[in-house]
Amino acid sequence: MGQLEYLITTGDLNSLNQLLAQNPALAKNAVSEDVSPLMLSCFYKKPDATSLLLKYLDKIDIFEAAAAGKFDILAYLVYTNPELVHEYNADGFTPLALACYFGQYEAARYLVFKGADVNQPINGNSGIRPIHLAAAQNHLDVVNMLLERNVEVNIQHDTGITPLHYAAKQGNLDMLIALLEDGADVNIPMEDGTTPADLAMNNGHFEIADILS
């Protein structure tokens, strides 16, 4: 792990700022797995590092804008090229998928308003949709927004997991209720037969397990 990557992942802002001040070009250089420093800060949930890196970047792409919640840049990029909302990055994510995963509500809502498909899976064979990503990360506001846009509430990805499975596993009662009110099926099992009630029980959410049983 290089110095830049280490400082981002540990959230050492003072040292990161000193390093970037000495060599601003580092903010543009990919780190491990060919990930940009900005995306790395998002994945490690280091918002202060994200803000710092943005000061050293003269431009970012739509995927970085969606992940970091840079609405002004996102809106400009979509305005200049509306088809970007359907594009995949090298890791197979759409801008909407990234906004949902990182809980960037305004970015996600704007992308949907501009034509992003709420049911478009990430690239590959996983079958993961934006609602899976939002539910897995406990972003209730994003899940509610997707439900309002007629997302497929019972959609499963490759292991059979539905959004309801995520809500049950995490004990998120508000999300659970929102999904159930939208028609979530409590009886859909995962590939191995595990139901949402099973996940709730296994994770100590007994009240939710009772609701789902």
Segments (PLM) and residue ranges:
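Ankyrin-repeat-protein effector appendages
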Residues: 1-6, 51-64, 80, 149, ...
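Alpha-helical adaptor scaffolds
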Residues: 119-148
